[in-house]
Amino acid sequence: MVPIRRTDLTSLSEGRALQPVSMPPAAVPLTVRTVLALLVLTALAVLVHGYHLGADDAAIYVPAIKNVADPSLYPFGSEFFMSHAHLSYFANIVGDSARLTRLPIDFVIFAWHAVSIFLLLLASWRLAALCFLRRSAQWGGVVLLAALLSVPVAGTALAIMDPYLTARSLSTPATMFAIACYLSNRRAQALAWLLFTALVHPHMSVFAAAFLVCLELARRPARRQENLLAFGMAAGLPFLFPLHAAQGAARDALYSRTFFFVYQWAWYEWVGVFAPLAILWWFSSRDPRGTTRVFRTLAGAAIPFGLFFTAAAMVVGMPVWLENYTRLQPMRSLHLVYVIFFVLLGGLIQEYVLKKGIARWLGLFLPLSAGMWFLQQASFPSSMHVEWPGSHPDNTWNSAFLWIRGHTPKDAVFALDPNYMLSPGEDMHGFRAVAERSVLADSVKDSGAVSLFPQLAEDWRSQTQAENGWQNFQLADFEKLATEFPITWVLTRRPGPGGLTCPYENRDLAVCRLPSSAELDR
């Protein structure tokens, strides 16, 4: 290990302004005090950013987790979430932990969400310790990241950390650990974290590996072998997907994900692409006070990383015959750029602005946290801010879902409005995730599965089209639907249609049982 220069040690001992050093300081030990501080930050992050079981993207991930914990669930339609789950071990890790501990599955999912936030903050603290000399600056980076977990990442439809559990919840801290280990010259540990990332989220692991390559190229000139390897990987890309436009229902599903196509992004979303990269370039070209060389290396590596994938997104988003490649979502690379950016920015804000003033810390982080709290309130206006496991929901949709979970058979198959997730008051909660019952495909989240797995397209279209005109369905329409699909129950607007037995109603919804074939024959 190359020692820190004597002049830097002299500056430290005399209390003079810290200057950048050529090597990072020795690894900061993880003390009980640090762990407690990270636990407090984790708790505050949950309270600020909220938690929502099975909402949005978790509507795909949570059913797979629950299916691992209880294989008797979801006898119909599981392909719409298992297509994702079969590609990783994320559902197995979480689902098996519930099965082995025998704890309530909703509590286990919430616990993993909290653990994932703790791990992200711990990994960010490890990385900040390599970039900043002062402990206060290191914590500045971690606290800023914790305060901004809900920040949207440009036009990618991602946040730094979602207020619900997904595979990204674990892949993000794993990626940060991999980067920190790599920059600490612990290559074996970096590889182990990279492999773990691939196991829980293969897609995001590609970006993690690419960033490590950018770090290596930033630290030393590219070797010919590396160039040949990169060329070989790029040469294989044309064989991933067919080189022609998507067809039929698969194309409809693909174009339902407008964020795949960067030319449809708004101007402010493009600002979200280039502003962080420009600031990171400025970071890499300066010698900020109290930073190490790792700071500049990290900032410098993020620039070609972000620009490369932005260029890739622009290429695949232009010609129609390349539109299948938009499924690779190269702009998701910005997710990692944002995490690194806020860690570095937070450290510099502390170093230059906040310093040791408690009032300054509160003056910055209280308004930021309040802004994130209001953002989440606006995103989930009809739900509790933190949907604690076992609590009684305010949301009438979730109330109906939970009644269904507790009062209908596990093999029940439901039908409901294919656009139910967009209904006022629903707040994007997934039926399968909360009710734990099978259901016909929807037009909101299941279309996302189809956009990535076009082999599901025809089943998806047949199920969603069969429910066209749902708002006007009467008994005869439900009976006709039951002849096409094995549905036994429906969730519809109150009051339930005449002729159906509806054992549950709330102020908005009714849960109704369809008559069996024997009852219809009478």
Specify the residue positions occupied by each region the protein language model found.
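Signature aromatic-anchored transmembrane alpha helix within multi-pass, membrane-resident enzymes
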Residues: E351-F380
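Extracytoplasmic
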Residues: S379-R522
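Active-site lumenal/periplasmic loops and adjacent helix-entry segments of GT-C-fold
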Residues: L30-T31, L44-L148, P152-A174, P202
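Transmembrane alpha-helices and membrane-interface helical segments
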Residues: L122, R126, F177-S184, F211-R219, ...
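Short hydrophobic alpha-helices at membrane interfaces in multi-pass membrane enzymes
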Residues: C181-F196, A222-A230
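Membrane-interface transmembrane helices that cradle and orient dolichyl/undecaprenyl
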Residues: M23, L170-Q189
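Transmembrane catalytic cores of multi-pass membrane glycosyltransferases
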Residues: V46, G50-A58, A69-P75, F81-L87, ...
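Start-transfer (signal-anchor) and selected internal transmembrane alpha helices
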Residues: M1-L44
